[in-house]
Amino acid sequence: MGNPARKTFRAKRDSRRAQTFKASLPGIVECPQCHEMKMAHRVCKNCGHYKGKEVVSVEE
């Protein structure tokens, strides 16, 4: 079996592994009620609607 020719340093090893653990962007969608950007599957912070119903009353 072959042996490593050179020591692999922590920085080189970790930067190589970084592509595996790269975080994906959160799902950001447009609210159908107020057309503001919001997280998917969450109540809109701007208008308080979720799935076409007003869940939270928002004071303006």
From Swiss-Prot:
Determine the domain of life of the protein's source: Bacteria
Please indicate if the UniProt record lists Ribosomal protein as a keyword: yes
Q: Which UniProt keywords apply?
A: Ribonucleoprotein, Ribosomal protein
A GO cellular-component term linked to this record: large ribosomal subunit
State the protein's name.
Large ribosomal subunit protein bL32
Note one Pfam family from the annotation.
Ribosomal_L32p
According to its UniProt entry, the protein's GO biological process terms are:
translation
**Molecular-function annotations in GO:** structural constituent of ribosome
**Annotated organism of origin:** Clostridium perfringens (strain 13 / Type A)
- Family indicated by similarity: Belongs to the bacterial ribosomal protein bL32 family.
**Is Amino-acid biosynthesis among this UniProt entry's keywords?**
no
